[in-house]
Amino acid sequence: MARGLNRVFLIGALATRPDMRYTPAGLAILDLTLAGQDLLLSDNGGEREVSWYHRVRLLGRQAEMWGDLLDQGQLVFVEGRLEYRQWEREGERRSELQIRADFLDPLDDRGKERAEDSRGQPRLRAALNQVFLMGNLTRDPELRYTPQGTAVARLGLAVNERRQGAEERTHFVEVQAWRDLAEWAAELRKGDGLFVIGRLVNDSWTSSSGERRFQTRVEALRLERPTRGPAQAGGSRSREVQTGGVDIDEGLEDFPPEEELPF
């Protein structure tokens, strides 16, 4: 089993004023909406900007410390991890991949350029949006092709986490790869270890029942297959791309309602 690695690094602008509240047990929860624009290279060598909005959750004493100090538009660095949660609602199982902040620091905004969305909310241009994961595939990769012939692969990654004083937890992350990277990933199999470097994106769609659904996933920019022991002495296989995805709307302007989010 691959060693678990689960780190998220974000630099963006606070799209709204942070929301502070407490659980019935008195635990402080600070929810932040961080917004930015990634600069990606397209197939023809040109550059394009892709907007993103990520909800970040900070708990406990740090939440209380920053709750009254942060405001809309402020630039913030977040180091944290992805946390997988499950719950049931009206007899249906739901899940969420949440960004849990471990550290947060406000940043000097001198020389930084912002953009505004249609609601006047700020986004940081040339932001930071990076994810580093290591885990094992939960299923064989699913490879398909778009009508334009672009390869896209979906992978399920199980990341084990053991924190001091806590039981081991497993976080399930959906990973998507494009083009040559997708075709390389299609050769992997369930149970294989995989190291992923990518960017965090959000999807939304309408279910067959008419409900709006959301999913947070990782768009892979680089994949490495770790090898352990003489059985895999052929060396690790790796693949890297300069950019991922196609021109789709990845900057979500809304999020799941609070009643959909467990804590």
UniProtKB/Swiss-Prot annotation:
Sample GO molecular function, one term: single-stranded DNA binding
Positions of region (Disordered): 224-263
Quaternary organization: Homodimer.
Function in brief: Plays an important role in DNA replication, recombination and repair. Binds to ssDNA and to an array of partner proteins to recruit them to their sites of action during DNA metabolism.
Full protein name: Single-stranded DNA-binding protein
Occurrences of domain SSB (ranges): 5-108, 128-227
Sequence motif: Important for interaction with partner proteins, positions: 258-263
Keyword Nucleotidyltransferase part of the UniProt annotation: no
Keywords attached to this entry: DNA damage, DNA recombination, DNA repair, DNA replication, DNA-binding, Repeat
Composition skew (Acidic residues), residue ranges: 247-263
Entry superkingdom: Bacteria
One BP term from GO: DNA repair
Family matches, as NCBIfam families: ssb (TIGR00621)
GO cellular component, one term: nucleoid
HAMAP family: SSB
